[in-house]
Regions:
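Bacterial Sec-dependent N-terminal signal peptides
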Residues: 2-39, 357
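Mature extracytoplasmic or organellar-lumen-exposed domains after removal of signal/transit peptides
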Residues: 26-357
Length: 357
Protein backbone atom coordinates (compact mmCIF):
# COMPACT_ATOMS: atom_id res chain seq x y z
CA UNK A 1 0.00 0.00 0.00
CA UNK A 2 1.57 3.28 -1.09
CA UNK A 3 -0.53 5.91 0.61
CA UNK A 4 0.25 6.90 4.17
CA UNK A 5 -1.95 5.85 7.07
CA UNK A 6 -1.67 8.21 10.00
CA UNK A 7 -3.38 7.59 13.31
CA UNK A 8 -3.07 10.25 15.98
CA UNK A 9 -2.05 8.64 19.19
CA UNK A 10 -0.30 11.51 20.96
CA UNK A 11 3.36 12.32 20.95
CA UNK A 12 4.55 8.77 21.57
CA UNK A 13 3.03 6.95 18.58
CA UNK A 14 3.57 7.79 14.95
CA UNK A 15 2.86 5.77 11.83
CA UNK A 16 4.95 6.05 8.72
CA UNK A 17 4.17 4.93 5.21
CA UNK A 18 4.68 1.38 4.05
CA UNK A 19 7.28 2.60 1.57
CA UNK A 20 9.30 4.22 4.34
CA UNK A 21 9.01 1.10 6.47
CA UNK A 22 10.43 -0.98 3.65
CA UNK A 23 13.40 1.33 3.19
CA UNK A 24 14.05 1.87 6.90
CA UNK A 25 12.81 -1.15 8.89
CA UNK A 26 12.46 -0.89 12.61
CA UNK A 27 15.26 -2.58 14.54
CA UNK A 28 14.46 -6.10 15.67
CA UNK A 29 13.99 -6.48 19.40
CA UNK A 30 13.95 -9.59 21.53
CA UNK A 31 12.78 -7.90 24.72
CA UNK A 32 9.41 -9.47 25.51
CA UNK A 33 7.89 -6.35 27.09
CA UNK A 34 8.88 -4.26 24.09
CA UNK A 35 7.69 -6.91 21.66
CA UNK A 36 4.25 -7.25 23.19
CA UNK A 37 3.65 -3.55 22.51
CA UNK A 38 5.12 -3.66 19.02
CA UNK A 39 3.09 -6.72 18.03
CA UNK A 40 -0.15 -4.80 18.68
CA UNK A 41 1.18 -1.86 16.68
CA UNK A 42 2.25 -4.06 13.77
CA UNK A 43 -0.96 -6.10 13.77
CA UNK A 44 -2.90 -2.84 13.53
CA UNK A 45 -0.71 -0.95 11.06
CA UNK A 46 0.55 -3.81 8.90
CA UNK A 47 -2.36 -6.26 8.89
CA UNK A 48 -5.74 -4.85 9.95
CA UNK A 49 -5.72 -1.29 8.64
CA UNK A 50 -4.03 -2.09 5.29
CA UNK A 51 -6.43 -5.01 4.81
CA UNK A 52 -9.48 -2.86 5.39
CA UNK A 53 -8.05 -0.11 3.18
CA UNK A 54 -7.57 -2.62 0.37
CA UNK A 55 -11.12 -3.87 0.95
CA UNK A 56 -12.55 -0.36 0.63
CA UNK A 57 -10.54 0.21 -2.55
CA UNK A 58 -11.69 -3.14 -3.93
CA UNK A 59 -15.31 -2.19 -3.25
CA UNK A 60 -14.79 0.94 -5.35
CA UNK A 61 -13.33 -1.14 -8.15
CA UNK A 62 -16.15 -3.69 -8.01
CA UNK A 63 -18.73 -0.91 -8.16
CA UNK A 64 -16.93 0.62 -11.16
CA UNK A 65 -16.78 -2.65 -13.10
CA UNK A 66 -20.43 -3.42 -12.34
CA UNK A 67 -21.44 0.05 -13.48
CA UNK A 68 -19.53 -0.54 -16.71
CA UNK A 69 -21.31 -3.88 -17.13
CA UNK A 70 -24.63 -2.17 -16.46
CA UNK A 71 -23.95 0.44 -19.14
CA UNK A 72 -22.40 -1.94 -21.67
CA UNK A 73 -23.27 -5.61 -21.06
CA UNK A 74 -20.53 -7.35 -23.05
CA UNK A 75 -18.82 -10.62 -22.21
CA UNK A 76 -15.54 -8.78 -21.63
CA UNK A 77 -17.18 -6.44 -19.15
CA UNK A 78 -18.85 -9.38 -17.43
CA UNK A 79 -15.47 -11.12 -17.13
CA UNK A 80 -13.96 -7.96 -15.64
CA UNK A 81 -16.77 -7.76 -13.08
CA UNK A 82 -16.25 -11.39 -12.10
CA UNK A 83 -12.52 -10.80 -11.66
CA UNK A 84 -13.21 -7.76 -9.48
CA UNK A 85 -15.63 -9.76 -7.35
CA UNK A 86 -13.12 -12.59 -6.83
CA UNK A 87 -10.31 -10.15 -6.05
CA UNK A 88 -12.47 -8.48 -3.43
CA UNK A 89 -13.36 -11.85 -1.93
CA UNK A 90 -9.67 -12.68 -1.53
CA UNK A 91 -9.14 -9.54 0.54
CA UNK A 92 -12.32 -9.92 2.57
CA UNK A 93 -11.80 -13.59 3.38
CA UNK A 94 -8.31 -12.82 4.65
CA UNK A 95 -9.75 -9.98 6.75
CA UNK A 96 -12.04 -12.58 8.32
CA UNK A 97 -8.94 -13.80 10.14
CA UNK A 98 -9.57 -10.97 12.61
CA UNK A 99 -13.33 -10.65 12.99
CA UNK A 100 -13.43 -8.57 16.14
CA UNK A 101 -14.11 -4.93 16.89
CA UNK A 102 -16.34 -2.83 14.62
CA UNK A 103 -16.77 -5.54 11.98
CA UNK A 104 -18.61 -7.53 14.63
CA UNK A 105 -19.93 -4.77 16.89
CA UNK A 106 -21.55 -2.86 14.00
CA UNK A 107 -22.74 -5.93 12.05
CA UNK A 108 -20.60 -5.11 9.02
CA UNK A 109 -19.88 -8.82 8.53
CA UNK A 110 -23.49 -10.10 8.30
CA UNK A 111 -24.54 -7.02 6.33
CA UNK A 112 -22.25 -8.00 3.48
CA UNK A 113 -21.50 -11.71 3.83
CA UNK A 114 -24.50 -13.69 5.04
CA UNK A 115 -24.78 -17.23 3.67
CA UNK A 116 -26.22 -19.49 2.52
CA UNK A 117 -28.26 -17.59 -0.01
CA UNK A 118 -31.43 -18.75 -1.70
CA UNK A 119 -31.67 -18.05 -5.41
CA UNK A 120 -35.43 -18.69 -5.27
CA UNK A 121 -35.72 -15.90 -2.70
CA UNK A 122 -33.58 -13.63 -4.89
CA UNK A 123 -35.68 -14.38 -7.95
CA UNK A 124 -38.81 -13.68 -5.92
CA UNK A 125 -37.44 -10.26 -4.96
CA UNK A 126 -36.51 -9.52 -8.56
CA UNK A 127 -40.00 -10.50 -9.74
CA UNK A 128 -41.71 -8.36 -7.10
CA UNK A 129 -42.67 -4.68 -7.22
CA UNK A 130 -39.80 -3.74 -4.89
CA UNK A 131 -38.03 -0.63 -6.18
CA UNK A 132 -34.62 -2.17 -5.45
CA UNK A 133 -33.17 1.12 -4.26
CA UNK A 134 -30.24 1.06 -1.84
CA UNK A 135 -32.61 1.74 1.05
CA UNK A 136 -34.71 -1.25 -0.01
CA UNK A 137 -31.62 -3.47 -0.03
CA UNK A 138 -30.62 -2.28 3.43
CA UNK A 139 -34.08 -3.15 4.74
CA UNK A 140 -34.10 -6.61 3.17
CA UNK A 141 -33.24 -9.97 4.70
CA UNK A 142 -29.47 -10.20 5.17
CA UNK A 143 -29.17 -13.07 2.69
CA UNK A 144 -30.47 -10.68 0.01
CA UNK A 145 -27.66 -8.22 0.69
CA UNK A 146 -23.92 -8.15 0.06
CA UNK A 147 -21.49 -10.27 -1.91
CA UNK A 148 -23.57 -13.30 -2.71
CA UNK A 149 -26.57 -11.77 -4.49
CA UNK A 150 -24.02 -9.92 -6.66
CA UNK A 151 -22.31 -13.27 -7.21
CA UNK A 152 -25.61 -14.84 -8.31
CA UNK A 153 -26.32 -12.08 -10.81
CA UNK A 154 -22.91 -12.01 -12.50
CA UNK A 155 -22.04 -15.72 -12.37
CA UNK A 156 -25.32 -17.59 -12.57
CA UNK A 157 -24.55 -21.24 -11.89
CA UNK A 158 -20.76 -21.71 -12.01
CA UNK A 159 -20.30 -18.99 -14.57
CA UNK A 160 -23.06 -19.87 -17.03
CA UNK A 161 -24.61 -16.39 -16.95
CA UNK A 162 -24.33 -14.49 -20.25
CA UNK A 163 -23.95 -10.72 -20.21
CA UNK A 164 -26.84 -10.26 -22.61
CA UNK A 165 -29.12 -12.29 -20.33
CA UNK A 166 -28.78 -9.99 -17.32
CA UNK A 167 -32.16 -8.30 -17.06
CA UNK A 168 -32.93 -4.67 -16.32
CA UNK A 169 -34.17 -5.61 -12.85
CA UNK A 170 -31.05 -7.66 -12.16
CA UNK A 171 -28.90 -4.70 -13.19
CA UNK A 172 -30.81 -2.39 -10.87
CA UNK A 173 -30.42 -4.85 -8.00
CA UNK A 174 -26.73 -5.34 -8.82
CA UNK A 175 -25.90 -1.63 -8.71
CA UNK A 176 -27.83 -1.05 -5.49
CA UNK A 177 -26.09 -4.04 -3.92
CA UNK A 178 -22.69 -2.71 -4.99
CA UNK A 179 -23.49 0.75 -3.64
CA UNK A 180 -24.53 -0.70 -0.30
CA UNK A 181 -21.47 -2.97 -0.16
CA UNK A 182 -19.17 -0.06 -0.96
CA UNK A 183 -20.67 2.00 1.85
CA UNK A 184 -20.24 -0.84 4.33
CA UNK A 185 -16.58 -1.37 3.41
CA UNK A 186 -15.76 2.32 3.70
CA UNK A 187 -17.58 2.54 7.03
CA UNK A 188 -15.56 -0.43 8.26
CA UNK A 189 -12.27 1.17 7.25
CA UNK A 190 -13.24 4.49 8.82
CA UNK A 191 -14.18 2.75 12.06
CA UNK A 192 -10.54 1.72 12.43
CA UNK A 193 -8.90 4.94 11.31
CA UNK A 194 -11.09 7.90 12.28
CA UNK A 195 -12.86 9.32 15.29
CA UNK A 196 -15.09 8.75 17.13
CA UNK A 197 -14.27 5.01 17.16
CA UNK A 198 -10.66 4.98 15.89
CA UNK A 199 -10.40 1.31 16.73
CA UNK A 200 -6.76 1.18 15.64
CA UNK A 201 -5.96 3.54 18.49
CA UNK A 202 -7.91 1.37 20.93
CA UNK A 203 -5.84 -1.70 20.00
CA UNK A 204 -2.47 0.05 19.98
CA UNK A 205 -3.06 1.74 23.34
CA UNK A 206 -4.42 -1.41 25.03
CA UNK A 207 -3.39 -1.27 28.68
CA UNK A 208 -2.26 2.31 28.22
CA UNK A 209 -5.39 4.46 28.09
CA UNK A 210 -7.47 2.47 25.58
CA UNK A 211 -11.20 3.00 25.97
CA UNK A 212 -11.78 -0.57 24.77
CA UNK A 213 -9.03 -2.64 26.36
CA UNK A 214 -7.97 -1.82 29.91
CA UNK A 215 -5.24 -4.45 29.64
CA UNK A 216 -2.99 -5.60 26.79
CA UNK A 217 -4.07 -9.12 27.61
CA UNK A 218 -7.65 -8.25 26.66
CA UNK A 219 -6.58 -7.09 23.20
CA UNK A 220 -4.45 -10.19 22.67
CA UNK A 221 -7.26 -12.47 23.77
CA UNK A 222 -9.63 -10.73 21.33
CA UNK A 223 -7.14 -11.37 18.53
CA UNK A 224 -6.59 -15.01 19.49
CA UNK A 225 -10.32 -15.62 19.93
CA UNK A 226 -10.87 -14.29 16.40
CA UNK A 227 -8.30 -16.79 15.13
CA UNK A 228 -10.07 -19.61 16.96
CA UNK A 229 -13.46 -18.45 15.68
CA UNK A 230 -12.50 -18.37 12.00
CA UNK A 231 -10.86 -21.78 12.29
CA UNK A 232 -14.07 -23.13 13.78
CA UNK A 233 -16.28 -21.28 11.30
CA UNK A 234 -14.49 -22.79 8.31
CA UNK A 235 -14.05 -26.31 9.64
CA UNK A 236 -17.15 -26.55 11.80
CA UNK A 237 -19.53 -24.40 9.75
CA UNK A 238 -18.68 -23.48 6.17
CA UNK A 239 -17.39 -26.96 5.38
CA UNK A 240 -19.10 -29.24 7.89
CA UNK A 241 -22.71 -28.11 7.52
CA UNK A 242 -23.00 -28.83 3.78
CA UNK A 243 -20.78 -31.91 4.23
CA UNK A 244 -23.03 -33.43 6.89
CA UNK A 245 -26.24 -32.64 5.02
CA UNK A 246 -24.76 -33.33 1.56
CA UNK A 247 -26.60 -30.18 0.52
CA UNK A 248 -24.81 -28.04 -2.11
CA UNK A 249 -27.16 -25.13 -1.37
CA UNK A 250 -25.51 -24.77 2.05
CA UNK A 251 -22.12 -23.97 0.50
CA UNK A 252 -20.73 -20.43 0.60
CA UNK A 253 -19.94 -18.80 -2.79
CA UNK A 254 -21.50 -21.63 -4.84
CA UNK A 255 -22.43 -19.63 -7.95
CA UNK A 256 -18.85 -18.62 -8.72
CA UNK A 257 -17.26 -21.90 -7.66
CA UNK A 258 -15.10 -19.80 -5.32
CA UNK A 259 -15.85 -21.69 -2.11
CA UNK A 260 -12.49 -23.39 -1.63
CA UNK A 261 -10.63 -20.16 -2.36
CA UNK A 262 -12.78 -18.45 0.26
CA UNK A 263 -12.02 -21.12 2.85
CA UNK A 264 -8.30 -21.15 2.11
CA UNK A 265 -8.05 -17.37 2.30
CA UNK A 266 -9.71 -17.46 5.72
CA UNK A 267 -6.78 -19.56 6.92
CA UNK A 268 -4.25 -17.36 5.12
CA UNK A 269 -5.78 -14.43 7.01
CA UNK A 270 -5.45 -16.32 10.29
CA UNK A 271 -1.77 -16.95 9.56
CA UNK A 272 -1.28 -13.28 8.61
CA UNK A 273 -2.50 -12.34 12.07
CA UNK A 274 -0.20 -14.83 13.77
CA UNK A 275 2.97 -13.77 11.92
CA UNK A 276 2.16 -10.05 11.71
CA UNK A 277 2.33 -9.90 7.94
CA UNK A 278 -0.04 -8.85 5.17
CA UNK A 279 1.91 -6.99 2.49
CA UNK A 280 4.94 -6.25 4.63
CA UNK A 281 6.58 -7.94 7.58
CA UNK A 282 6.00 -6.93 11.16
CA UNK A 283 6.38 -8.47 14.56
CA UNK A 284 3.70 -11.06 15.17
CA UNK A 285 2.35 -13.21 17.95
CA UNK A 286 4.75 -15.87 16.65
CA UNK A 287 7.67 -13.73 17.83
CA UNK A 288 6.24 -13.65 21.33
CA UNK A 289 5.59 -17.38 21.33
CA UNK A 290 8.98 -18.37 19.92
CA UNK A 291 10.76 -16.27 22.54
CA UNK A 292 9.22 -18.42 25.29
CA UNK A 293 8.19 -21.69 23.63
CA UNK A 294 9.83 -22.56 20.31
CA UNK A 295 8.08 -25.92 20.16
CA UNK A 296 4.64 -24.31 20.36
CA UNK A 297 5.49 -21.81 17.63
CA UNK A 298 6.75 -24.61 15.39
CA UNK A 299 3.61 -26.64 16.08
CA UNK A 300 1.29 -23.74 15.26
CA UNK A 301 3.10 -22.78 12.07
CA UNK A 302 3.26 -26.41 10.92
CA UNK A 303 -0.46 -26.88 11.55
CA UNK A 304 -1.33 -23.63 9.78
CA UNK A 305 0.68 -24.64 6.72
CA UNK A 306 -0.84 -28.13 6.73
CA UNK A 307 -4.38 -26.75 6.97
CA UNK A 308 -3.82 -24.23 4.17
CA UNK A 309 -2.16 -26.76 1.87
CA UNK A 310 -4.84 -29.39 2.52
CA UNK A 311 -7.35 -27.43 0.45
CA UNK A 312 -5.26 -28.19 -2.65
CA UNK A 313 -6.17 -31.87 -2.29
CA UNK A 314 -9.82 -31.04 -3.01
CA UNK A 315 -9.82 -30.83 -6.79
CA UNK A 316 -13.50 -30.21 -7.57
CA UNK A 317 -15.98 -27.52 -6.56
CA UNK A 318 -16.77 -27.93 -2.88
CA UNK A 319 -20.45 -28.48 -3.62
CA UNK A 320 -19.26 -31.52 -5.62
CA UNK A 321 -16.59 -32.49 -3.08
CA UNK A 322 -19.19 -33.02 -0.35
CA UNK A 323 -20.44 -35.89 -2.49
CA UNK A 324 -17.42 -37.09 -4.48
CA UNK A 325 -14.33 -36.15 -2.42
CA UNK A 326 -15.49 -36.73 1.12
CA UNK A 327 -12.18 -38.18 2.32
CA UNK A 328 -10.22 -35.13 1.16
CA UNK A 329 -12.85 -32.82 2.62
CA UNK A 330 -12.79 -34.64 5.96
CA UNK A 331 -8.98 -34.50 6.03
CA UNK A 332 -9.11 -30.73 5.68
CA UNK A 333 -11.70 -30.43 8.44
CA UNK A 334 -9.50 -32.62 10.63
CA UNK A 335 -6.52 -30.34 9.99
CA UNK A 336 -8.60 -27.31 10.89
CA UNK A 337 -9.84 -28.94 14.06
CA UNK A 338 -6.28 -29.83 15.12
CA UNK A 339 -5.24 -26.21 14.60
CA UNK A 340 -8.25 -24.97 16.51
CA UNK A 341 -7.43 -27.24 19.44
CA UNK A 342 -3.87 -25.90 19.59
CA UNK A 343 -5.02 -22.29 19.37
CA UNK A 344 -7.58 -22.84 22.09
CA UNK A 345 -5.68 -25.24 24.30
CA UNK A 346 -2.12 -23.89 24.02
CA UNK A 347 -1.90 -20.42 22.45
CA UNK A 348 -4.70 -18.89 24.52
CA UNK A 349 -3.21 -20.18 27.81
CA UNK A 350 0.18 -18.86 26.65
CA UNK A 351 -1.31 -15.37 26.29
CA UNK A 352 -2.94 -15.60 29.71
CA UNK A 353 0.31 -16.76 31.31
CA UNK A 354 2.79 -14.38 29.73
CA UNK A 355 0.79 -11.21 29.01
CA UNK A 356 -0.70 -10.22 32.32
CA UNK A 357 -0.78 -6.43 32.06
Amino acid sequence: MKNKLVIALGATIMLVSACHKTEDPAPVTTDFNTMKEQVLIDFTNKVAVPGYKDLADASDNLYSTLQTLNDNPTEDNLAAARTSWKNMRTIWEQCEGFLFGPVEDNDYDPNMDTWPTDYVQMDSLLNSSNNLEVSDIQAATLSLRGYHPIEYIIFGNHGDRKAADITTRQKKYMISLATDLKGTCHDLYQSWTADPVNFAKQVITAGNGSAKYAKKQEAYLAIVESMIDICDEVGGGKMKEPFDTRDPQMVESPYSGNSLADFKNNLVGLRNVYIGKYKEDGLGINDLVSSKNVALDNKLQTQMTAAINSFDNITVFYEDAIINQRVQSQNTMNALNELKQTLEGELKPFIIQYITD
